[in-house]
Amino acid sequence: MDFTNFVGFDGKKELLPCGFDTFDSEVKLRQLFLHLSNFVLNSICHFNKYEQKNFAKIPLKNAFESKIKSLLPLHKLNRLNNFDKNRKFNLCSSSTRIINNYYNPKTSQRLIVNSKKLIPAAKLISHCFINNKMQLLMDKNLLFHEFVLEKLRKLHKDKEVLDLGDSISIKQKDVCALKIYTSWKNIQRKDPNIEKEVNHAINVIKEGDYNQVYLIYPKDNDFTRHIPVYVEELKYKTYQIKAIPYSLRSIIRKNI
């Protein structure tokens, strides 16, 4: 498997992005991953600011093990013959089996839990406990896309911000729509290496629905300003193509 576009962990092995901008340490890169993982895991769990800051100090495997533990109710390890029979529970057999297998498939203990509380824990286990091994790998381009999308929705509340899957569209009444493509790619200002993305932007403009296309990448030390792109074959059209740096620093600032 090619791990080039993935971040996360495979057992004790961590796949963190190369250091960039102010993300110059293992702790900051872990914190970045924990924050961005919320976009994919939002229906299962959420790492709050405190967890992001403190779990970043330990390996990602341990961080997710701690998160699973925090999602389980306090009575998770009660034996069948010791639990409070006067307390009512809605048992979820599938979730119970998942959690039992996660802790110890040979144990004689059985979990007596409230299914409403258990389901997130079981779902998280099913996402990151694969073949009896802790593992969670995510597409970094998807994570960056979701991060930019959330930022744009907060910034342009008076406009229509649409997630088109491979791109983002911003529409406003009586104004030509803007199309945005995101990519987690290290950009060097003198040699940005974005020919493929620019050619795609040219085709989008030629189709006529958009005259502005922005190519957004993570901000880095050598990529701090917009890079305008001029295209000879579009010189008689009104258009705008830009490569734009997008900062991820707010993730660190939020958790200080």
Predicted segments, located by residue:
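Catalytic core segments in nucleotide and nucleic-acid processing enzymes
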Residues: 134-256
